[in-house]
Amino acid sequence: MDQTATPLSGDVTPRPAAAAIAVAAIAVLIVSYGVNAMDRTLFPLMLTDVRREYGFDLSQGGLMSTIFTLGMTLAGIPTGYLMSRFSRKTVIQVGILIYSLATIITVTAIGFADMLFYRAITGIGEAMQLTALLAVFSSYFSRHRAAGVGLLNYAYAGGAAIGPTLGARLLDDYGTWRAPMIIYGVIGLAMMVLIAAVVRPQLSETNTAKQATTGIAAGGAASLKNLNTVVLVALSILFGLALYGYLGMYPTFLREELHYAPRDAGRVMGIYGLGVLISLFTGWLGDRFSPRLVLGLSFLLASAVAGLLFNGPADFTTQAALSFVLGATFSGTIFVNLAAYHVKSVTANLAGRASGLFVTCVYGSATAAGYVIGWIAGFAGWTVAGNIQLVLLCLAGAAIALMLRGDQMARQPKQGT
C-alpha cells in the first residue's frame, strides 16, 4: 500500500490537532455561556438606577428584572424542536445575536411597556443558546452527563462573578446604566463571530442516539410522561421561583434596604458566582449518588442559607459569605443536577426535548419571581418576602425530592473500554 499517494482530506485531522481543536471549541462555548451569564446578571444591578429614572415601583422593578425568563419559557421547548431541524451551532449563534441586540436596544426604551418587551426578547435568545448548549454538553460528555453540565456551569460561575463586578465599575466610570448594557451587548456579538470561526460540527452535533450502544448510558423512560420527569418539573418550577427571587431582586435589597454602594453590591453578587465553581464536583456527585439525596439535601441547605441572608447580619462579610454558599447550592448544585436528571430520566433520543422542558419549567416560574418578591417586599418587608419565596419554597423542594426514583433513570453500563 502506497502511504504517500493519498493526502489528508479536509475531513481527516491528525489526532493531536483534532484534540486541540476540540479543546478550543469547548473553551469558546464555555466562554460564550459566561457572556450569557454576564448579560443576565447585569440588569438587576442596574435596577435601582433604572427605577430612579423611570419611576418604577418595587413590583414593577421586580417584573422588569426577571421578565427575560418569559422569553426563555416561550423559547425553551420550541428550541428543542429547532435543534432537530437545524444545527446546534446555528441555534447557539442565533440565540446570542438575539439577546445581544435586545440588550443594546433596551437603553432606548421610553417607558415601562417597551422596556419590558426588550427585556423579554433577551430571554428568547438566552434560552436558545442555553438549550442548545445543554444538548451539546450532555451528548458530547455522554458517559458523565451531570459532570458535563457541571463543566458548562463553570461558564456561569465566571460570568456571574465578572458580570456584576464589571457592570458596577462601568456604572461608576460612565455615570449611566446605559453604558454597561451597550458594552455587554457588543461583547455578545463578538462571541457569535468567534463561535462561527472555532466550533466544528464534529463537536456540536454529537448525537449519542446514533452511536454504538457500548459505553452509552442505558435506561430512562421512552416518554416524557414518567414519574421522575413529573417530579423534576415540580422541583424546577419551585427552583425557578426561589432562584430568580434571589437573582432578580437581591441586588435591590442590598442597595435599597441595606444601603450598599453599587460596587459593594456588585462584589457580593460576584461572590455568588464564585460559589458556582464547585459545579464540576457536584455534577460528579450527581452521577454517583441518589437524586433524592443530592437534591433533597441541597434544597434543605438552600433554605437555611436563605433564612440567614434575609434575617441575619447585614455586614458585607456575612452577606458575601452567605451568597457564596447559596451560589454553590443554587447554581452550583441544584441547577446542574436538575438539568442532568431531566436528561437522565429519558432515553438518549429525547435529550433535546428534556433539556427544553427543564429550561421552560425553571424560567417559566422565574417570570413571576421578581414581581412576587417585589410585591411582598413592598407590602410586608424584605424579611417576610425572603422567608416566603426562598426559605419556604426550598423546604417544599426538599420534601418533593424524596419522590424521585433513581433506579428508573439512565445509568452507565459497568463494562468499559
Protein language model features and the residues they cover:
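Conserved MFS/SLC helix-loop-helix module at the cytosolic interface between two early adjacent transmembrane helices
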Residues: L74-I110
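Cytoplasmic helix-loop-helix junction between adjacent transmembrane helices
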Residues: Y118-Y156
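Helix-to-loop junctions at the C-terminal end of transmembrane segments
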Residues: A75-S87, S279-S290, A377
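Helix-loop-helix hairpin linking two adjacent transmembrane segments in secondary transporters
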Residues: L151-V199
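Extracytoplasmic gate region of multi-pass secondary transporters
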Residues: F43-P44, N228-S279
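A late C-terminal transmembrane helix in Major Facilitator Superfamily
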Residues: V343-W382
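C-terminal transmembrane helical hairpin of 12-TM major facilitator-type secondary transporters
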Residues: S290-L338
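Juxtamembrane intracellular "pre-TM" segments in multi-pass secondary transporters
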Residues: G10-A18, Q202-V231
